[in-house]
């Protein structure tokens, strides 16, 4: 189980990302439209003005069950060991155990 502070920090980042999403997207479109280098630098300065944690690259996928940030499967939203436990308990329909 991940620490609760890490999970809360991730939720805060998600809220910030949603809040500044339109500002970032519009600034990136402006950069692609402008041809002069000085104007691009000005717009790039605007792009750096939102908080650092509002960048989408700083978000992590977390396991819904445990909050683990590593080894997640996007299709299920679970980490590897929780996914395996749920496969064995037949809680995920359509999944089969691999045997070799």
Curated annotation (Swiss-Prot):
Keyword Lyase listed = no
The record's section on Pfam families has: Ribosomal_S14
Q: Does the keyword Metal-binding apply?
A: no
Name a GO CC annotation attached to this entry.
Answer: small ribosomal subunit
Q: Which Gene3D superfamilies would you find in this protein's record?
A: 1.10.287.1480
Q: Which GO terms describe its molecular function?
A: rRNA binding; structural constituent of ribosome
Any one Gene Ontology BP term: translation
Query: Which compartment or compartments is the protein found in?
Result: Plastid, Chloroplast
Alphabetical UniProt keywords: Chloroplast, Plastid, Ribonucleoprotein, Ribosomal protein, RNA-binding, rRNA-binding
Write out the function statement from the record.
Binds 16S rRNA, required for the assembly of 30S particles.
Protein family (similarity comment): Belongs to the universal ribosomal protein uS14 family.
> Which HAMAP family does UniProt cross-reference here?
Ribosomal_uS14_1
Family matches, as PANTHER family:
30S RIBOSOMAL PROTEIN S14 (PTHR19836), SMALL RIBOSOMAL SUBUNIT PROTEIN US14M (PTHR19836:SF19)
NCBIfam families linked: PRK08881.1 (NF006477)
- Subunit structure comment from the entry: Part of the 30S ribosomal subunit.
Q: What is the official name of this protein in its record?
A: Small ribosomal subunit protein uS14c
What taxonomic classification does the UniProt entry list for its organism?
Eukaryota, Viridiplantae, Streptophyta, Embryophyta, Tracheophyta
